[in-house]
């Protein structure tokens, strides 16, 4: 099963997604964390769920 968690970060309300499976393998899509508080929220979620991030995908670059 694929799990999806999203966060809305920064003054531009950029959505960041963490996708992970039952084996705790995951990817981050469009990390838009802007400050320390937002970075901590993302890191804490990943640590809490014990997700191993295998890739970071940037799909909304200009």
At which residue positions do the language-model features occur?
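Conserved beta-strand hairpin/beta-sheet module of binuclear metal-dependent hydrolase folds
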Residues: 1-49
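Metallo-beta-lactamase
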Residues: 52-62
């Amino acid at each position: 099963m694929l799990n999806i968690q999203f966060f809305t970060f920064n003054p531009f309300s950029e959505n960041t997604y963490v996708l992970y499976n039952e084996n705790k393998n995951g990817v981050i899509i469009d990390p838009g964390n802007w400050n320390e508080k937002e970075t901590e929220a993302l890191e804490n979620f990943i640590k809490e769920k014990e997700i191993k991030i295998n890739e970071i995908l940037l799909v909304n670059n200009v």
